[in-house]
Regions:
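Basic/polar N-terminal segments that are highly enriched at the extreme N-terminus
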Residues: 1-2
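Active-site-adjacent loop and "lid" segments of alpha/beta metabolic enzymes
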Residues: 203-209
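Divalent metal-dependent hydrolysis catalytic cores, especially in the metallo-beta-lactamase
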Residues: 40-48, 71
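Short, ordered coil/turn segments that flank beta-strands lining enzyme active or ligand-binding pockets
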Residues: 13
Length: 221
């Protein structure tokens, strides 16, 4: 287990997906300042390409807070990444969070693609993001349902491409704590270069296991 834990707060991005919880820019700035006061390390401020409002919020939050890293979400799409970089232009500490689905369900039914093509798209996205910022976080969407051997292959490839943070999401709230902890441990034991990056978790609460899975990830990472 690492001696240093970082708190990554996604209230202003993923939290807004809760029905009825949309915030305007002024309200988002108030939340961001409160998170800074609490000592949150990274604030995921939004998904800039998704709407003009999200773009504006990331810009204004970047101006309003001082020491937390401001993170912007993207898909593994060049225009997403370019727009995110523009939204982060005023951030003192900036991070682009890019990624792609890695489970066979996503590969086949969402992307109509192959495992090989997904690796290529993941690597290309990280390399493109590195043109704008040094701190690049990669998410393997639906990692909870991705077999560990293939997940390790993707993670190793994006680390070689320059990713500084690896996010392992349980997107569908599928995993039990033992299973999720073992997934993190597998990556620690099988991915070259994993000790040179930060491992992040993003656990959904469909089965009420988000906190337990997060703690299992910490114990094994």
């Amino acid at each position: 287990m690492s001696d240093r834990l970082f708190i990554f707060d996604t209230t202003l991005r993923d939290g807004e997906q809760v029905p009825g919880c949309q915030l305007n820019t002024v309200e988002k700035i108030q939340v961001a300042k409160a998170l800074e006061t609490l000592g949150v390390d990274i604030i995921e401020a939004g998904f800039p390409v998704s709407s003009p409002g999200d773009f504006e919020s990331v810009v204004e939050i970047s101006k309003a807070v001082t020491w937390p890293t401001i993170c912007a979400l993207t898909r593994a799409v060049e225009n997403d990444i370019k727009v995110a970089a523009e939204a982060l232009r005023y951030a003192k500490h900036k991070r682009i969070h890019t990624g792609i689905g890695t489970s066979d369900y996503h590969i086949k039914y969402k992307f109509n693609s192959t495992r090989e093509e997904i690796v290529e798209r993941a690597v290309a996205a990280v390399k493109y993001a590195k043109k704008f910022v040094e701190d690049v976080q990669f998410y393997a969407e639906d990692a909870g349902r991705t077999d560990n051997e293939y997940l390790a292959r993707v993670v190793e490839a994006v680390i070689k491409a320059g990713a500084t943070v690896i996010n392992i999401p349980d997107t569908t709230g599928y995993c039990l704590p033992d299973e999720f902890g073992q997934k993190i441990l597998y990556l620690k034991e099988h991915v070259s270069g994993i000790d040179n990056v930060t491992i992040a978790t993003h656990c959904h609460n469909d089965l009420g296991m988000a906190t337990a899975n997060t703690m299992a990830g910490i114990q094994n990472g």
